[in-house]
Amino acid sequence: MIEQLPKYMKRKLLILVTAVVMQMSFAQTESTFGDGEWFKFKMSYSGWLKAGNATLTVKETTLDNKDVYHVVGKGWTTGMIKWFFKVKDRYESYFDKTTLLPYKFIRDIDEGGHTKDIVIQFDQKDNKAYVHDKKKNTKKVFDTSPNIQDMVSTYYYLRDRLDVSKMKIGDEVRVDMFFDEENYGFKLKYLGEDIIDTDFGKIASLKFRPYVMAGRVFKEEESLTLWVSKDKNKLPLRIKADLRVGSLRADLEAFKGLKHPFRIIVDN
């Protein structure tokens, strides 16, 4: 059918198709985050006692000749809390810059004497996870779901790819995640829009309920609430968690390297 069109119409059609493809490509490549992004959080226990700090850092690098984001998350207790419950956690994820699928995950934690030192290599093509437990000196291979995510990459994947404009309050999304030697169906519930007071001022936000595994740390599946900025950055502004003993709150207190403008609501 196209071959039967006049030459000038073919040229116009080609220009139109090219323009559409360029727009689609632009929409797919305009990510919410990038190289050099850095967050710092302050944590408090049961609403008043300073508990610690956490940071998230994004760097561009290569891994096995693949262009990846390398994200490092650190968390540690401070002050009085540190004397009776010391926490020193480090999480790392190397995930593809285009697909946001992870190739390598590192979990090195010490939480009140509960320690883990694990490295996971993901084979996204053959759906395998190669788990090296350095503490136990064991190596195991597990089958994974297609397009599997790790604990860290899940957050960046949802932050970048979730289209909230198409969601209603109560809607849930599911992501296949590999955690602690098993496939885990991570779920996130949308709770609507909110305006919260922060160290930076009033911020329009989106509110979510990440489902967590109840057990040693969390009181129940719906123990966690997350607020992210209602802009292109999707900044993690606040996290509240109901623990088996007390509660924990993390608030964003510093940031740099944002890709998009950060908006604050100014009272008239």
Segments predicted by a language model, with ranges:
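Hydrophobic, well-structured mid-protein blocks that either form specific transmembrane helices
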Residues: 118-162
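Generic detector of intrinsically disordered, low-complexity segments in short proteins
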Residues: 1-2, 267
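Acidic, serine/threonine-rich low-complexity disordered tracts
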Residues: 28-124, 164-268
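Hydrophobic-ligand-binding modules of eukaryotic lipid transfer/binding families
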Residues: 10, 25-27
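Position-driven detector of the extreme protein N-terminus
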Residues: 2, 23-25
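Bacterial N-terminal signal peptides
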Residues: 15-23
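Positively charged n-region of N-terminal signal peptides that target proteins for export
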Residues: 3-13
